[in-house]
Each structure stands twice: as structure tokens, then as C-alpha cells.
UniProtKB/Swiss-Prot annotation:
Matches recorded under PANTHER family: SORTILIN RELATED, SORTILIN-RELATED RECEPTOR
Source species: Phaeosphaeria nodorum (strain SN15 / ATCC MYA-4574 / FGSC 10173)
Function of the protein: Functions as a sorting receptor in the Golgi compartment required for the intracellular sorting and delivery of soluble vacuolar proteins, like carboxypeptidase Y (CPY) and proteinase A. Executes multiple rounds of sorting by cycling between the late Golgi and a prevacuolar endosome-like compartment.
Leader sequence residues: 1-21
Cysteine disulfide links: none
InterPro entries: Sialidase_sf, Sortilin_C, Sortilin_N, VPS10, VPS10-sortilin, WD40/YVTN_repeat-like_dom_sf
Biological process, per Gene Ontology: Golgi to endosome transport; Golgi to vacuole transport; protein targeting to vacuole
Family: Belongs to the VPS10-related sortilin family.
Matches recorded under SMART domains: VPS10 (SM00602)
Biased composition (Basic and acidic residues): 603-615
Name of the protein described by the UniProt record: Vacuolar protein sorting/targeting protein 10
Glycosylation sites: 288, 922, 1212
Key word Ligase present: no
Lumenal side: 22-1296, 1371-1421
Length: 1421
């Protein structure tokens, strides 16, 4: 449609001729209430209104537009009133568990109940075409998981009890939940869309969108992108005729928007160079033909850019920059009611000064008559002054001021427009609330800057000389002025408060009735034909070249008016264009008709035009072969390398990819590449001493210099976006971590610096912590506390009901260096603080646990643990726990609701070993998992969990501990666990029998080198995306040999069977989720690599250089999804980085076909991992049969974006001995049975009764493995009988009857857990490690060894300082200094795979796990 300004119909001012007044003033009726009022609402097109008292919860109803009010006494303790927006007779009143619904505008109500309270975040979802179909959402559980709740549904308006729709939902809504979405279509009447928890995960990165047509008896996950489903769903909303779903990438705040018009076909919305981020976009009140989105263009000031989509919601173009927003995401954007295309916005005129210097915003108002494509100034009639208005709905009246910018609200006056915003005039001095009635023939306003006793009204369109006043007889502070939503009534309601006699204030509702002012009702003849009806009529005009077209996607406007051009910015080729040698293609002219525009004929500006192929943003040409690029650098060592992996790659757009790596050499030069090492450039000109990638967001990276200057980027260094800020003080000199990051607020930083440290050995020098909420910019640093060892943000995505501002610090008491540490906490940047613990040894903050170790008066250590950061519980250990002194620890893993620690038993150099212990689910009880596990001097432990598959782990043990204690060299063997060992083949890769074959597993097993002996400690056996695949370097025999004797082995079945793939020691990496595996000789000069495309069946050679170079490492992106790799090494005196690109191979030109409905139809098989010691049902692993997607070996295609490899839990298995482990205080015997540790007494089984249990079981030596989901069968944890707790005998008898079968009650551990720390009994893996063997089964270790007599103690993440000469050892996240030439300790979140950002080490570990450190692994500059 083409809008002609002078002929626009006004939204509300129908401009009917004023009727002759029969009375001098409207009638007034006042009703007084004791409490403040909320939820004042009219039923549409009626005179019935509802209102609620805030204090009492009472609901009142008025049938006569507010003249008289009556309490609805049956509606008790209502929490809120929610009207059905699609039916003016229906409303809900929600209570705690009892609720009420009306279908006759509140005259009668029917009650119903739900189990829990309604959600505070949109508790009701209405069906737009059936008023009986309603969804009720219960309050979400946000403590231990991201906020997930339960939803009920009704199809009969709650005549019957509501039924459970789905549990574990983020949100749900009807497909027909918007008036225009699926309008007029008969299908999908019962369709519901829900964002649910992941298949087998509660993490927000795994949230899925599910669609059901039968109330979730069955459900499907829609295909969103490139024929694949998409995880990480964050939100969805209906916008006119569109449904928009937002997807959040892991380790990033970046979002992708997917749009559909039918719930069946989804498209990835494209914003050109724009980027959508979490909490940084607002979907605005859009038109019928397009979606309008305001996107924050600055992270730390509320300024945005307005984008408008094309008609299918796919392509968005920027219309205006510097729109004004507030911190809550509300945008100064208003549409003139009932008229498509007229938009008013406020822009920030001095945006650059606001962003750079924090200047005060200068706001200006602009209006558009073409749906936001072009904007112009607001003009006052008879004046050349600009008008600026405060944002307000309806906007044919507004409070504002003339001049250069928008002033304060209280300095504004009331203006009115009678031509839909084209021109404006002053109505009343001072700011007023206002409302329209009788289609605009009556305008009412009330003073809004304080108390007033007058109400103003105009019957002549609000012109300044037409206003009259109504004397109320008392002063009122106006809160709200309203009428019917369509402004057709002559009755208004004014709500406010007035002073009471005797003090205080009372609340009043005043009805203003203008009906008696008219002698007669206006008839048709009284209306000017031009303004006869507020219903718009349309007349198509001839298309105008300048007014009816806008720039198409990929083009940006240049010039204005007739000189306006649309210049190519990013041209995307149409499908199949520019192939087969074509030099041109038919593409966009650069123009498109404005969405919804109904012009005809005239200009044909949007017709396709011929364009040259080389104008398009083409992906690099495919070479049909592997390519390599060698880059040389000055220096002797690479100090640091980090991948900044983008998690929102769009597989549909081959140009929308970057693989960014940052690297630091020992020349103190930082380099950056965006194409995985094909082209490098200097990141910054200054010398850099450390690189800090953001712990939680891969888009952020920081380059620290030797001064206070810090360079940083918020988008992976793209588009020359590296800026700088000044830190408050120099970095600390105490080897402490310098930067700490917030998991949610990406711009919140804690800087650990050194104060008064300019002079060497200054006595005044001490550490000081500072915080910035603006990423260090704009002099935003505020001091926290001084004399601190560590400060960290406490908030996490789930499990901690704390403020985002909460910070824990370890501070020296009385601010004295060397004084004992105390743990202090604050929610307001330490304006107030709380001392949590004194005499602190160490604190560890992880994703799930917070562990604090303190020293007692007798020099023993006490351990306290918390899940919620509020309540701590003490951990108790068996008798004689501290008899064996601990000297060091290494944190191995805490990714499965328990902490794995290695406790050093022998700390002597080159003779280190210790025990692995495992905590229960709340971190308060530790039990033995494996003895005599090997460790090296740097603190690394030979222990690694397999990635992508739970429960499989490999460790190396020292088998001659007695000799080692006497000074002998360590002899090591490898153990693997799938729960209780694994089977091995007896043939080598060449088909020959091993020399040791037939000698039994003691003499003939496979042993592999772990962390402690790897040349590059950043390598891993497995990949998070190549399920079931592992590579290792080792040998077959009686014990682990040297690296020089080692060969390279591979397994494709999670360690059940292994085969030798190459003689000698190789480094490896996985690409495209296992589609390609590349290996290279480690630490030797070489000119080639080997690669396999069929999971190791065939190995091919690729020569990447004409001369040999020494390769020290091979890397790829942390997710192992790329087809690019980097080799790192040296060529003579130069450093070299070699890019290997496999994407050109013909085998990867097609994207793999994955259909979840028929998973084996396309390019994938379903793989089921097996248990090596389950003769009856080998497919049962942890009590269930799990199915995983694995690409077929002969499939010639690429996986692309990360796949959710877990397809399904096919079934649960019956319980067997393999589903149980030894209970607390029990140890495994050589025959496999569990026996009470000598000297300990049985626990009192009745102890659970004092904690609220109604029954208890006899003590069992066994407990179920936490990962097991087995059902029935041999339940070893219920070997005894169940008994009633005192006082529950009768209930027990009724429940159990003759069957004697009862609810399982876990035997809790012998310590008192405080509130908030539940009894999730997570179990010990004692004795579950079996040799990687070729022969028969045997005991895993000697239980008579003195190292098994008592579970060895360790403090999670804490240094056990009880030895005479304590040895401080960092956790796994410490990078081995010197291995890669570094001169600095490791970062708290950096692993041996530190430059592979986000990658796990000993297991798939949350970034938080890096918090667990000893003193010597901290930072130094």
C-alpha cells in the first residue's frame, strides 16, 4: 500500500463534529479502596471492568464502566487477572493452587486446581480460535537446573481436571496462539510447540523445540537448518503472522533467529553484518507483512538499530541507527494505532559520545510514514521548531518539548496531532496523562507532575483553546487514566490516591461520564466523508520509484531522495548460480518492494538483473584435493594458542564461517587468523605477555601487555574490532589469576592487580581486586577488596539461587599480608560483606560445587561443601582419615555430579603416585576409586574419561609401589573401566600373534601412555563428537614401555577392542566429528601426515611440504567439527604453523543426510555401545541400551554442524551385579564381593527416620551406580528387608501389605547435611578398573595393600597443607610450563588442550572446573 501523508486516516481522532453539550460537565462517581489497586482491566467492547486490591488480593467487578464496584467474594487470594485477548467474555484469576475462570465477563466463575503455583513468566497460553483450549504453566524449578517447569492443558475450559501436557519445559504455546498466525487455516487446531529440556540433559545448550498434535503423546523435533534439527532453543514468540524461535550458541551470547509462517517450514533469519545477542534484541510490534526487530548495537549503553524483514521474515535490512532503548530492552518505538506504516521512534543524536565517553543521551523524535524505511522530524504547526516526545502507546497525543533534544518528562507539555503525526500543536502546558473517547471526539487529560484537583477535557480535537476543567473537589495523585481499549466509550476511569483525614492515603477510582454532555448521538450525516469511519479503506496507486521500494538484502542505501542508491554489501548467490563456468547470473536489482505495499504498475525497479559472478561473496573454490598453507614466524616457541570457536555456524551459507585462532610467540607478538591458519596477521602492535580468552564466551578475547593497557575484542577480532582499555592497576606479581569472568554477564570482569607495586620489594605492595560491569571500558573499574588471593563470581546457570553480583573472595584477615585467609562474600561489590569462613586453606568454585577447606586448631583440615552458595555442610570421613598425610592433589573431573580427585601418596620426584577418590553428589563424602595411580612432578595424572560416552575411563597405575617407596623406578600398567574391565584381542595390526600371547593378562595386555608422558599434554584419547573412537600410543606386554618403543593404537567401540594402526608414536586429531582422522609423527622431522576417511580401515598419505619440519602438535577446533587442521612446529630457527584443509575432497562436497524418524535410512548407522562383562546382555551399559548416530564408513558426505549423537535410550535393562558398587565404608575383595572395612561398625539403618523417612532398609554392602537406570532384576542394594520407621507402622502395613515391596530409601552417609544439600548418594568406583587385557579376568588390584586400608583423603581443589614440607601442585588445568615454551602458569580454566577453547581434559569438563588450582599454577606477569 502506498501512504500519502495528507490523506492518512488518524488512528483515534476520527474528528467527528462536536455534539452540542446538554450539561456543563460530565458526571463523577467515586469509589474508595483501602489498598493499592492493580490489574485494572476492561473486557473489550463492553462496560464490564475488573480490578484487584494489591494487599488483600480481593477482586472487584463493575458492570457499568466503573460507576459501581462489587467484591467477588468467591475469588479468594487471587494473584492476578488474565484476560483472553481473543474472546472478550473470558478471563482467568490465578491463585496459588486454586484458580477461577469466567466465560461471561465475570458474572459467574468456575474454580479448578493445579498442584503448584503458576509461573511468574507468562502463566497462561490461549488458543486464538477456541476459548476452551488453554495451557497453564506452573512455576519453574530454577535451583538445580535452568528454569524448567510443568504445563497443564484443558480442552473444555476446565470443566474437568486439567491434564499434564509435558514436564521439563522451558515454555509452551499453541500454534494458533496469535490472531494472524495460521489465520483461516483449518489444520493444526491442536498443535502445540514447546521448548523442552534436552533428550538426556538439563543444560540450556541442549534445549529442543518439540511439536505435538496429540498433547505430547507423540512429538516431533522440526527441521530448522540444512535438514537438521537445532539444539539450544532459548525462546519463541508469535509476531503477527510469523513465529520466531531464538537459538543460543554454547559458549557464546550470540543468537540465531528461525522464522516460520506455518510451523512446518523454518528459515534461518539473516541480518547481513548485524548480529543478534542474548538479552540484546527486542521483537517490536510488527506489521502484517514484516517483522521489526531492534538490536542492541552497543553492549554497555542502551542504543540499538532497527531492522525490518522482507515478507517471509527471512532477510532483514537495517532501517535506522541509534534507536533509544532502556536497560530492560524496551524501545522508544510506537505505531499509530489502526494505521499500517506510521511509526514514531526516538533516536540518540550523540550516540558516539555516549558509547565512547558515557555522555548523557540527547534524544530526538523521528516519524516514519513508510513503515520505518525513512524518518523525518516532527513539526509543530505554524513553527519550524522540532518536537520531541516521550514514548507512549497510541501516539496521537504525547508529552514532549520543542528544541534540540528531548528533555525531562516533568519539563514537557502535552501535544496533539489530528493528522496521524504529520503535524503537531500544543494542547496543554505541563505533563499530563491522557485518553481518548467516542472515537476521538472527547479527549481527557489529568496533570501528571503531582497532586491536582482538576481533570481537563476537550471536545474539539484537543486544540489549546478548547480545553475545559472538571473540579474533583479534592486533590488526587493520578496513577492511571483509561477507557475501553478501542476508545469508543464516553466513560473514563481515573485511578489515583488522595490524603486521608488523620494521615495516610487512600485509593480511589473515579468514573468520568461524558454521556450526558451530548443532546443526541452522532449520525452518519454528522461525519465529514473524509473522516467518516475509523475503518481504513485502500486504493492502489501506481508504483513510485522512490517511495515504494527499499534496499534488498545484501545491499545498503547510499544517498537520499532521488539520489538514493542500493550498493552491494554482501551478495549471496542463488542456488546453482555461477556453476559450470558461468560468468553471470540473474540476481537482485538491489531493490525490493516494501513489504505489504500494494502499488501496481509504474516502476519495475525490483525486477532481476544480470550480475557478474565475481561480484558475489563466493566461498573459496573447491580444489578436489587436500591443500596446505605454511606460515613462518620469528621465535623459538609458541607460548599460547587458543581457538575462539564460533558455535552458530550457518551451514546454509558457506560464507558465514570463520575459524579464529589467536596465538602468542616467545617474541611477545600476538597473531590472529580467521581462516584456521591460512592467513595470519598481528592482533595488536604492542608486546603481549598473556592472552586471556573469555571463560564463558568464545567471542571475547583479551591481550594483556606489561603495563595497564589491555587490548580486547568482543567478536573474535573480526572487522578490525580490537580495542583497548586501561586496567585500574598493574597486574599482580603474586602469580595469581589476573582476570575472572562472569558466566552470564559477559562484560563483568574482576581484575586482580598489584597496588603500590611500582617499586621493587615495596613493603606497601599488595594485591587488590577491582570489578568492571562494562568490560573495562569508560573508566568503569570499581575497587572491591585488597589483600586478596582470589575473587570470583559465584552465580551459575543452575543450582544457585543467588544474585548475579555475588562475589566470593579469599582475603587476608585484617588486611595484613601473610595473615590467615578468610572467605568473604558480598552481593553489592563489598559495600557490605559477610565472613563465611576463617582460616581458609583454599576455595574451589565449580559449575556445581563450592568447596571450602579450613584449618582446625589441631592442624587438621575441615572440608565444607555447598551446592547453592548459601548453605554449607561439613564432610565427614571414616576413622583414621587423617592418619595418612596428604601432600598434594589434582582435580580430575567433576562433570557427573561428583568430584574425582587424585591424592598424592608418594610426592618424591619421579616417584609420584596416589589414589583417586570420588565424592558423593554434594561433595561432602569421598570414597576410594582406584589406588596407586601414576602422577608426574607437574601434577598431571594418568587418568582420562572418554568424551561423548559416560562411564568409560582409562588410568595408569603403579604396580610396584613397595619397591617405588624404597626408591625403585615405577612400573606402570593401564586400566580401563566400562564398569568392571574390558576385553582385548590377541592379534596385532600386522596379523601376527603378540609374543606374550597365552601368558594371561598379567603378562600380556595393552598399556598406553597418558598425560604424564605425552610430548604434547593437550592431546586426548577421544573426541566429544566422534563417539566411540579413541587413539592411544602404547605397547602390549607386562608393563608400559618407553615412548620410543610405543606404537599407535585405535578403537572404534569405546575401548572394547583395539588394533595397531601404525608403528611408532603419532599425534592425532579428529575432524568433521570423526569423518576424517589425521595423524602425524610427533617430535620428529616429517613432511607428511596420514589420514583416514573410514574410521581407520585405510590410511592415506598426504605430503604437506617439500622439506621436512619438526611437528610438535596437531590441533583443530574444540568441537572437532572442522575439516581444517593446524600443525605446529619448527623449521630450523623459525616457527611454523601449517594449515591442512580437507574440505576440497570430493568425499565432503555433500552434506550428510540425517533423519531422526528413520535414522538408518540416510548416511548414518545406529551404534550401541556394549559392556565387556555382560554375557547375557552385552548391549546393556549402565542399565540401559543406548543408540548413537555414527556416520557410515562408506558414506561420502560431511557432517557439518555438531550433531546430537545420542539418538535414543532404546530400553532399560534388568539390574545385575554390574549395576552396583561397594557402599560407603565397604571395599571390594579380590572375588568382587564388597566387605566392611576392618575396624568399622555398620551404620545405623534407622538414621534415615530422623530425617523424615517413613521406612528404612537393612544395611547393604552395595549401592547402585548413579549412572545406571536399570530396573528390577537383582537389586543388590535391597538385599535385606524393609522396616517401618517409628510412628509409621500402620501406613507401612497399608503400603506394603503381603507383597512386602516398598519404596527404595537410600542409606544415607553418616554425616548431617545442611539444608539445600540433598542426599543424592553417588557411588564409589572402587575396584572397577580392569586391565586393558587380552586374556582372562582377574582382580583389579591387591586389596591387602596398605594403600587400601583406609580411603585416602583429599580436599576438592584444596591443597592439603599438613606435611612438613607441603608440595603445591596445580590441577589438570595448569599448562606444563616449558613444554610449549611458556613462562607463565596456567589459567584457571585452561587445560593441556588450552588453546582448544572449551575442550575438556581428563573428561568433558565444564569451564568452571578450571577454578580448581594450587598456588603454583596461578598467573604471573
Amino acid at each position: 500500500m502506498k501512504y500519502l501523508k495528507g490523506l492518512l486516516l488518524p488512528a483515534l481522532l476520527a474528528l467527528a463534529p462536536s455534539a452540542t453539550a446538554a450539561k456543563d460537565a460530565p458526571s463523577i462517581e467515586t469509589t474508595t479502596f483501602s489498598n493499592e489497586l492493580v490489574n485494572l482491566q476492561y473486557f473489550d467492547d463492553s462496560t464490564v471492568a475488573l480490578v484487584q486490591e494489591l494487599g488483600s488480593g480481593k477482586i472487584y467487578r463493575s458492570p457499568d464502566a466503573g460507576k459501581a464496584w462489587k467484591e467477588l467474594k468467591d475469588l479468594k487470594k487471587g494473584l492476578g487477572i488474565i484476560k483472553n485477548p481473543y474472546d472478550n467474555k473470558v478471563a482467568l484469576v490465578l491463585g496459588e493452587e486454586q484458580h477461577w475462570i469466567t466465560y461471561d465477563q465475570g458474572e459467574t466463575w468456575q474454580d479448578f486446581k493445579t498442584e503448584y503455583s503458576p509461573s511468574p513468566n507468562g502463566p497462561v497460553s490461549w488458543h486464538s480460535q477456541d476459548n476452551k483450549k488453554i495451557l497453564i504453566h506452573e512455576i519453574e524449578d530454577c535451583l538445580f537446573t535452568p528454569c524448567l517447569g510443568l504445563t497443564y492443558y484443558t480442552t473444555d475450559g476446565f470443566k474437568t481436571k486439567p491434564k499434564t501436557l509435558v514436564e521439563g519445559r522451558r515454555m509452551c504455546q499453541w500454534a494458533k496462539g496469535s490472531e494472524r498466525f495460521l489465520e483461516g487455516q483449518e489444520k493444526h487446531d491442536d498443535r502445540i510447540l514447546c521448548i523442552l529440556r534436552g533428550k538426556y540433559s538439563d543444560r540450556s545448550k541442549d534445549f529442543r523445540l518439540m511439536i505435538s498434535d496429540d498433547y505430547f503423546k507423540t512429538a516431533e523435533e522440526p527441521v530448522m537448518s540444512s535438514g537438521r534439527t537445532v539444539q539450544g532453543m532459548a525462546n519463541m514468540a508469535a509476531v503477527k503472522g510469523y513465529l520466531v524461535a531464538a537459538v543460543k550458541a554454547d559458549h557464546s551470547s550470540e543468537l540465531s533467529l528461525y522464522v516460520t509462517q506455518d510451523t512446518e517450514n523454518w528459515h534461518h533469519a539473516q541480518f547481513g553484518n548485524g548480529k543478534i545477542e542474548e538479552d540484546a534484541y527486542t521483537i517490536l510490534e510488527s506489521t502484517n507483512y514484516s517483522i521489526q526487530v531492534d538490536v542492541m548495537s552497543s553492549k554497555y549503553v542502551s542504543i540499538g538499530s532497527l531492522y525490518t524483514s522482507n515478507s517471509d521474515g527471512l532477510y532483514f535490512t537495517k532501517n535506522v541507527d541509534n534507536t533509544n532503548r532502556n536497560p530492560d530492552g524496551f524501545v522508544d518505538f510506537e505505531k499509530i494505532a489502526n494505521i499500517q506504516g506510521v511509526v514514531l521512534v526516538n533516536i540518540v543524536d550523540n550516540a558516539k559520545a555516549v558509547q565512547e565517553r558515557g555522555a548523557h543521551k540527547k534524544l530526538k523524535s523521528r516519524i516514519s510514514f513508510d513503515d520505518g524505511r525513512t524518518f523525518e522530524e516532527l513539526k509543530v504547526k505554524g513553527s519550524d521548531k522540532e518536537l520531541h516526545l516521550h514514548s507512549s502507546p497510541g501516539i496521537v497525543m504525547g508529552v514532549g518539548n520543542t528544541g534540540d533534544e528531548l528533555g525531562k518528562y516533568t519539563d514537557g507539555d502535552l501535544y496533539v496531532s489530528d493528522d496521524a503525526g504529520l503535524t503537531w500543536e500544543l494542547a496543554l502546558d505541563e505533563a499530563h496523562k491522557y485518553e481518548f473517547g467516542d472515537q476521538g471526539s472527547v479527549l481527557v487529560a489529568v496533570f501528571d507532575e503531582g497532586d491536582t484537583d482538576k481533570v481537563m477535557y476537550s471536545l474539539k480535537h484537543g486544540r489549546k483553546d478548547t480545553w475545559k476543567s472538571i473540579d474533583l473537589g479534592y486533590k488526587i495523585r493520578a496513577r492511571e487514566l483509561t477507557t475501553l481499549s478501542d476508545s469508543t466509550s464516553l466513560r473514563f476511569l481515573l485511578y489515583g490516591s488522595k490524603k486521608k483525614d488523620g494521615g495516610g492515603r487512600e485509593h480511589v477510582l473515579i468514573q468520568l461520564d461524558f454521556n450526558d454532555l451530548h443532546e443526541r448521538k452522532c449520525e452518519d450525516k454528522d461525519f465529514d466523508p473524509k473522516w467518516s469511519d475509523p475503518t481504513p479503506t485502500f486504493e492502489s496507486c501506481e508504483c513510485d520509484e522512490f517511495r515504494d521500494f527499499e534496499c534488498d538484502f545484501g545491499f545498503k542505501p547510499e544517498g537520499e531522495g532521488k539520489d538514493k542508491k542500493c550498493v552491494p554489501e554482501k551478495l549471496t548467490l542463488p542456488k546453482d548460480a555461477c556453476k559450470n563456468g558461468d560468468s553471470t547470473y540473474m540476481g537482485s536489482s538491489g531493490w525490493r518492494k516494501i513489504s505489504g505495499n500494494q502499488c501496481k504498475g509504474g516502476s519495475k525497479k525490483d525486477e532481476k538483473t544480470e550480475r557478474k559472478c565475481d561480484e558475489a561473496d563466493l566461498p573459496p573454490p573447491k580444489s578436489d584435493k587436500i591443500t596446505s598453507e605454511i606460515t613462518r614466524f620469528k621465535g623459538s616457541n609458541f607460548l599460547e594458542q587458543y581457538y575462539l570457536e564460533r558455535s552458530t555456524q550457518n551451514d546454509d551459507d558457506e560464507t558465514d564461517h570463520d575459524e579464529t585462532v589467536v596465538m602468542l610467540t616467545d617474541e611477545r607478538t600476538a597473531w590472529i587468523t580467521h581462516d584456521h591458519g591460512k592467513q595470519w596477521k598481528k592482533a595488536v602492535d604492542d608486546e603481549v605477555v598473556r592472552i586471556y580468552p573469555h571463560q564463558y564466551d568464545n567471542n571475547y578475547v583479551y591481550f594483556l601487555t606489561a603495563s595497564k593497557k589491555v587490548h580486547y575484542s568482543e567478536d573474535r577480532g573480526l572487522r578490525n574490532s580490537i580495542h583497548s582499555f586501561e586496567a585500574p592497576v598493574m597486574p599482580n606479581q603474586e602469580m595469581l589469576q589476573i582476570l575472572q569472568f562472569h558466566p552470564k554477564q559477559k562484560g563483568w570482569l574482576i581484575w586482580m592487580g598489584g597496588k603500590n607495586c611500582e617499586k621493587v620489594n615495596s613493603k606497601e605492595c599488595h594485591t587488590a581486586a577491582y570489578v568492571s560491569q562494562k568490560n573495562g571500558k569508560d573508566e568503569s573499574w570499581e575497587p572491591l577488596v585488597s589483600y586478596v588471593k582470589k575473587c570470583a563470581f559465584v552465580w551459575r546457570e543452575a543450582g544457585r539461587d543467588v544474585k548475579e553480583e555475588r562475589v566470593f573472595c579469599e582475603q587476608h584477615a585484617n588486611e595484613e599480608t601473610g595473615a590467615p585467609l578468610q572467605l568473604i562474600s558480598s552481593d553489592d561489590w563489598f559495600k557490605k560483606q559477610d565472613v563465611k569462613f576463617k582460616s581458609v586453606v583454599e576455595i574451589a568454585l565449580m559449575s556445581e560445587f563450592i568447596i571450602v577447606a579450613t584449618k582446625e586448631k589441631d592442624d587438621t583440615l575441615r572440608l565444607d561443601a555447598s551446592l547453592d552458595a548459601n548453605t554449607f555442610a561439613e564432610a565427614r570421613f571414616p576413622p583414621k582419615f587423617f592418619d595418612i598425610h596428604q601432600t598434594a592433589y589434582t582435580v580430575l573431573d567433576s562433570s557427573t555430579h561428583a568430584i574425582f580427585l587424585h591424592v598424592t601418596v608418594n610426592p618424591r620426584v619421579d616417584q609420584e603416585y596416589g589414589s583417586i577418590i570420588k565424592s558423593n553428589s554434594n561433595g561432602t563424602s569421598y570414597v576410594l576409586s582406584l589406588n596407586a595411580v601414576n602422577r608426574n612432578t607437574e601434577g598431571y595424572v594418568d587418568f582420562e574419561k572418554m568424551q561423548g560416552l559416560e562411564g568409560v575411563a582409562i588410568a595408569n597405575v603403579v604396580v610396584n609401589v613397595n619397591e617405588v617407596n624404597d626408591g625403585a623406578k615405577k612400573k606402570k600398567q593401564t586400566r580401563i573401566t566400562h564398569n568392571d574391565g574390558a576385553d582385548w584381542r590377541e592379534k596385532d595390526a600386522e596379523g601376527k600373534a603378540y609374543e606374550c600371547a597365552g601368558k594371561g593378562e598379567e603378562k600380556c595386555a595393552l598399556h598406553v601412555h597418558g598425560y604424564t608422558e605425552r610430548a604434547d599434554p593437550r592431546e586426548m584419547y577421544s573426541s566429544p563428537t566422534a563417539v566411540g573412537l579413541m587413539l592411544a600410543v602404547g605397547n602390549v606386554g607386562e608393563e608400559l614401555g618407553t615412548f620410543g618403543e610405543a606404537d599407535t593404537y585405535m578403537t572404534t567401540d569405546a575401548g572394547l577392542t583395539w588394533k595397531e594402526i601404525k608403528k611408532g608414536s603419532y599425534a592425532w586429531e579428529f575432524g568433521d566429528q570423526g569423518s576424517v582422522i589425521v595423524i602425524v609423527r610427533r617430535g620428529e622431522d616429517t613432511d607428511h601426515v596420514y589420514y583416514t576417511l573410514d574410521s581407520g580401515e585405510k590410511w592415506n598419505l598426504y605430503q604437506f611440504s617439500e622439506r621436512k619440519i619438526r611437528v610438535d602438535a596437531i590441533t583443530t577446533v574444540p568441537s572437532d567439527t572442522s575439516l581444517n587442521f593446524l600443525l605446529w612446529g619448527k623449521d630450523g630457527k623459525e616457527l611454523v604453523a601449517v594449515n591442512l584443509d580437507f574440505s576440497g575432497l570430493p568425499q565432503f562436497q555433500r552434506k550428510c543426510d540425517l533423519d531422526e524418524k528413520d535414522p538408518e535410512k540416510g548416511d548414518f548407522d545406529l551404534w550401541i555401545p556394549q559392556h565387556p562383562l555382560q554375557p547375557d546382555d552385552k548391549q546393556c551399559l549402565f542399565g540401559h541400551v543406548a543408540e548413537y548416530h555414527r556416520k557410515k564408513r562408506d558414506a561420502e558426505c560431511r557432517n557439518g554442524q555438531r550433531i546430537d549423537h545420542m539418538h535414543n535410550i532404546q530400553r532399560n535393562c534388568t539390574c545385575t551385579r554390574r549395576d552396583y558398587e561397594c557402599a560407603y565404608n565397604y571395599e571390594r575383595q579380590p572375588g568382587g564381593e564388597c566387605k566392611l572395612i576392618e575396624g568399622l561398625d555398620l551404620e545405623d539403618p534407622t538414621a534415615v527416620c530422623s530425617k523424615g523417612a517413613k521406612e528404612f532398609w537393612d544395611v547393604s554392602p552395595y549401592r547402585k551406580i548413579p549412572l545406571s537406570t536399570c530396573e528390577g532384576g537383582n537389586e543388590f542394594d535391597h538385599m535385606g528387608d524393609v522396616h517401618p520407621c517409628p510412628g509409621f507402622e500402620e501406613e507401612f502395613e497399608k503400603k506394603h501389605g503381603i507383597s512386602g515391596f516398598g519404596l527404595f530409601m537410600a542409606i544415607v552417609l553418616p554425616f548431617a547435611a545442611a539444608g539445600g544439600i540433598g542426599y543424592y548418594v553417588w557411588r564409589n568406583w572402587d575396584g572397577k578398573f580392569g586391565r586393558i587385557r587380552l586374556g582372562e579376568n582377574g582382580g583389579a588390584f591387591d586389596s591387602d595393600s596398605r594403600w587400601v586400608q583406609w580411603p585416602i583423603a583429599a580436599i576438592s581443589g584444596l591443597v592439603a597443607v599438613v606435611a612438613a614440607i607441603p608440595m603445591l601442585v596445580g590441577s589438570l588445568y595448569r599448562m606444563v610450563t616449558g613444554r610449549m615454551g611458556g613462562g607463565y602458569g596456567g589459567r584457571t580454566y585452561t587445560s593441556r588442550s588450552s588453546f582448544a577453547r572449551g575442550r575438556g581434559d581428563y573428561a568433558v569438563v565444564d569451564p568452571d572446573e578450571g577454578e580448581l588450582l594450587g598456588d603454583d599454577s596461578d598467573e604471573e606477569v
